[in-house]
Amino acid sequence: MFASIWQTRAVGVLIGCLLDVVFGDPKRGHPVALFGRAAAKLEQITYRDGRVAGAVHVGLLVGAVGLLGAALQRLPGRCWPVAATATATWAALGGTSLARTGRQISDLLERDDVEAARRLLPSLCGRDPAQLGGPGLTRAALESVAENTADAQVVPLLWAASSGVPAVLGYRAINTLDSMIGYRSPRYLRFGWAAARLDDWANYVGARATAVLVVICAPVVGGSPRGAVRAWRRDAARHPSPNAGVVEAAFAGALDVRLGGPTRYHHELQIRPTLGDGRSPKVADLRRAVVLSRVVQAGAAVLAVMLVYRRRP
């Protein structure tokens, strides 16, 4: 039915994008949630306060997911490779749920329903919302929308397009493990080291591709491409994450807002450097960030298909 593996992959990636746009994440039985529960169970066996134990934990889980992806991709049938690629891409994407949550938080903040916004924030990021007021919730949500534009949208598409089902499932496993154990808390400082470093590697190229797309797409929301480039070049390296800083700085410059500052997690308070030199973000800026994030995802889908066809022999 399809002339080559490259056409199969391109069609599968596009169908996966469409599934995410139409359905978003399933409320029950999401593969990522199932993986997370399995990882938590395995941690009860593998946990030791050391880097080697953490590397073994990550290697077992990512290796198992990668092997599963390779097996799914090689099952016989003319349509199966397309279905496998589409399903894996859909499972790895989270753009629709990200946008929905960002909009819901902006709606709540616009109505001054701070308590409800606090309850919703943990579904978007790992911040501690208990001490955040409206401005703090707005900044936390905007920063999370920016960072997850890469993690939940652009990077999975690029892995799916470049290397197929094993790679996109492996990427999602790495990213999920980083969100579970990649913290500098007393428990995970050493055990989570491998997950955090592997996530840095897996996102390195994709985060910069995301920033480029932010620059290109900024005018859609009345943003500044020049401001995005300026903030990216000047501020990104000051962020503690080599990848999140790139994307957050580009968003800050594009939207002419100022991000960073005191950032409270459940296990620590971080004083992060300032990204961008604009105003403090308002609820309207959060709405613009959500729209920009969706436009960037569309651009990433186009980029992914171009990448597939560029790799054709």
UniProtKB/Swiss-Prot annotation:
Signal sequence interval, chain numbering: none
* Keyword Transmembrane set for record: yes
Native organism is Mycobacterium bovis (strain ATCC BAA-935 / AF2122/97)
Q: Which InterPro entries match?
A: Cobalamin_biosynth_CobD/CbiB
One GO process term, biological-process aspect: cobalamin biosynthetic process
Q: What does this protein do?
A: Converts cobyric acid to cobinamide by the addition of aminopropanol on the F carboxylic group.
Record Pfam families: CobD_Cbib (PF03186)
Give the family from UniProt: Belongs to the CobD/CbiB family.
Pathway assignment reads:
Cofactor biosynthesis; adenosylcobalamin biosynthesis
For this entry, the protein name equals Cobalamin biosynthesis protein CobD
A GO molecular function held by the record = ABC-type vitamin B12 transporter activity
Identify its membrane topology class.
Answer: Multi-pass membrane protein
Q: What sections of the protein cross the membrane?
A: 52-72, 79-99, 154-174, 204-224, 289-309
Q: Which PANTHER family match?
A: COBALAMIN BIOSYNTHESIS PROTEIN CBIB (PTHR34308:SF1)
GO CC term (a single one): plasma membrane
The UniProt record lists the keyword Coiled coil: no
Give the record's keywords alphabetically: Cell membrane, Cobalamin biosynthesis, Membrane, Transmembrane, Transmembrane helix
Subcellular location field: Cell membrane
